[in-house]
């Protein structure tokens, strides 16, 4: 993970310090001037050494995730603020030269940006990640069987339970309690239960097994659930993937891998189908098989489709099926939102919320957790979907 951007991170650490050293530190006079400059550079040298630890580690992330989390926190604490200040100061210096003013107001703007950076960092790390919100949505369809009018589905995704190990276990218990408090008819987990490997799930089997719904808990596989984020032989990865699936079933969840089940209410029924993860086929596995998942399902059936990656909706689900409602996750809204805007909008057309195409809809959950314990403006989300039968007047 860090290895891929190591050069960029080192440049981000060094270049701002070169600017600050030249523009400010060299002006310091006196016997201790060199000592002060050395002290200023020490954190940067330390971050370069810390970065090199990841460069020589072939893993996507270290087995002890805290090593990565501490590093990323220090990047936000030390490197990003200096980048922001140096950028603002340099722009201000250029403007000062152009308009021939004495004051460099870019320095003031830079200080403000540093304070804002630290606010976002500390809030997202120590407040935002611990928050859970319940989001109510209503989906209406004339095709919904009458017996399912008012049917309640709780959707959650992207648990990344390994991030809760080491002091945050109570947060996952709170998620379970919040889900159960909704008295759902069905619960759908839209993938990414783990970060790297199934050993993260083992401590939480009893907790997650406590999720209750009248018609059960259904789940699908996410890209993190394949153990592709560890350096291991194909056999070890296959064993890990097998254990992840077995642990989900041990929790009482019904894992749907290109398959479906029928839920009945009297003579009426709906289909809950689940696809294997279906990403771009490059960075993310593309294994979804819509036809296999809906094999034997009537064209007149009402289908709720679960698929981790929302890009699959337009790529496969819309053209290859009649599934009326699709439930996805994956994006996390990049764990950063200001108002209704998220940088995820640069990457995903559908990144969070309810989206429609004619009478068909996609609901993308922004998830409850994350590989990195940070959320700003996008608290952990539990989506409560109430399905309503739309009455069509003749």
Identify the function of each model-found stretch.
Residues 147-393:
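Soluble catalytic domains of enzymes that build or remodel membrane lipids, polysaccharides, and related
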Residues 1-10, 98-103, 130-135, 159-172, ...:
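Short N-terminal secondary-structure initiator segments
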Residues 19-28, 99-116, 138-145, 172-187, ...:
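Short, charge-rich amphipathic segments
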């Amino acid at each position: 993970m860090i290895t891929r951007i190591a050069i960029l991170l080192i440049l981000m650490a060094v270049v701002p310090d070169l600017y600050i050293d030249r523009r400010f530190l060299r002006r310091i006079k006196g016997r201790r001037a060199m000592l002060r400059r050395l002290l200023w550079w020490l954190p940067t040298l330390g971050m370069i050494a810390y970065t090199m630890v990841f460069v020589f580690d072939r893993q996507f992330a270290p087995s002890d995730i805290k090593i990565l989390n501490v590093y990323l926190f220090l990047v936000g604490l030390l490197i990003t603020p200096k980048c922001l200040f140096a950028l603002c100061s340099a722009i201000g210096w250029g403007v000062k030269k152009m308009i021939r003013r004495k004051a460099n107001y870019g320095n003031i703007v830079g200080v403000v940006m540093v304070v804002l950076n630290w606010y976002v960092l500390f809030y997202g790390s120590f407040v935002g990640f611990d928050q859970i919100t319940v989001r109510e949505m209503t989906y209406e369809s004339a095709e919904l069987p009458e017996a399912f009018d008012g049917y309640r589905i709780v959707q959650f995704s992207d648990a990344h339970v390994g991030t809760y190990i080491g002091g945050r276990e109570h947060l996952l218990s709170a998620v379970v309690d919040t889900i159960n408090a909704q008295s759902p008819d069905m619960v759908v987990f839209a993938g990414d239960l783990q970060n790297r490997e199934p050993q993260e799930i083992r401590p939480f089997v009893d907790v997650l097994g406590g999720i209750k719904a009248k018609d059960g808990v259904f789940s699908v596989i996410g890209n993190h659930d394949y153990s592709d984020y560890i350096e291991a032989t194909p056999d070890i990865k296959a064993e890990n993937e097998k254990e992840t699936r077995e642990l989900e079933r041990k929790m009482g969840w019904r894992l749907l891998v290109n398959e479906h089940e029928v839920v009945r209410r009297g003579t009426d029924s709906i289909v809950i189908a689940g696809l294997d993860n279906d990403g771009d086929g490059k960075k993310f596995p593309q294994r979804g098989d819509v036809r296999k998942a809906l094999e034997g399902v009537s064209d007149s059936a009402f289908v709720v489709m679960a698929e981790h990656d929302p890009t699959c909706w337009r790529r496969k689900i819309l053209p290859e099926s009649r599934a009326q409602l699709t439930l996805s996750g994956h994006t996390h809204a990049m764990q950063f939102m200001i108002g209704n805007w998220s940088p995820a909008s640069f990457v995903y057309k559908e990144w969070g919320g309810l989206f429609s195409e004619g009478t068909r809809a996609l609901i993308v959950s922004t998830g409850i957790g994350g590989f990195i314990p940070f959320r700003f403006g996008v608290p952990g989300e539990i989506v409560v979907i109430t399905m309503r039968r739309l009455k069509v007047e003749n």
